[in-house]
Amino acid sequence: MSTRNPQRKRRGGTVNSRQTQKRTRETTSTPEVSLETEPIELVETVGDEIVDLTCESLEPVVVDLTHNDSVVIVEERRRPRRNGRRLRQDHADSCVVSSDDEELSRDKDVYVTTHTPRSTKDDGATGPRPSGTVSCPICMDGYSEIVQNGRLIVSTECGHVFCSQCLRDSLKNANTCPTCRKKINHKRYHPIYI
């Protein structure tokens, strides 16, 4: 039996190993950096005007905390009638804007409600403009503003109404109706004369 001497590998290898070459490259190629920091000198010149932009006015802002004008939410629950129907209340979803001053009478309280009273519903008012008026849904101009600015009221073949400028500009970007996205082009709409 022959006995072999086990050979051990040394970490780090010989002098010309890759790790040794890498270490020598890193140390020789790194430029020396000075560890001392130099302070920056600020030079003030006489006559420079300093402008304070933190305050908009010279007078202090005074907040009066002696009066409490606040919105009070009034929640009234609807009570069912005996026959099962709910009792209708006109001020069910309302709030009261009032002052805490006892000197002022409660007659000056303002009631704000989310429901439209019956009288305005019956008059035909559906929004900011009465029904029957024509407006462009893009620029929100009404008929009179459109005509005063030299534009026309136009309708697409799908029936949607716009001012001529808004529809022309919209068709430059996309060949579809701005409302329903049906494919149209500049030949697929016509002016409306009212």
UniProtKB/Swiss-Prot annotation:
This protein's domain notes: The SUMO interaction motifs (SIMs) mediates the binding to polysumoylated substrate.
Residues that coordinate or bind Zn(2+) 2: C158, H160, C177, C180
One GO BP: positive regulation of DNA-templated transcription
Classification via Pfam families: zf-RING_2
Residue ranges of the motif SUMO interaction motif 1: 40-43
Annotated pathway: Protein modification; protein ubiquitination
Disordered: annotated span: 1-39, 110-130
Organism: Mus musculus (Mouse)
Zinc finger residue ranges, RING-type: 136-181
This protein's UniProt keywords: Activator, Cytoplasm, DNA-binding, Metal-binding, Nucleus, Phosphoprotein, Transcription, Transcription regulation, Transferase, Ubl conjugation, Ubl conjugation pathway, Zinc, Zinc-finger
InterPro entries to which the protein is assigned, alphabetical: RING-HC_RNF4 (IPR043295), RNF4 (IPR047134), Znf_RING (IPR001841), Znf_RING/FYVE/PHD (IPR013083), Znf_RING_CS (IPR017907)
Residues reported in the UniProt entry to bind Zn(2+) 1: C136, C139, C163, C166
Sequence motif: SUMO interaction motif 2, positions: 50-53
Region of interest called Required for ubiquitination activity, as start-end residue ranges on this chain: 1-20
Consequence recorded when altering V161A: Abolishes homodimerization. Strongly reduced E3 ubiquitin ligase activity
Name this polypeptide is given: E3 ubiquitin-protein ligase RNF4
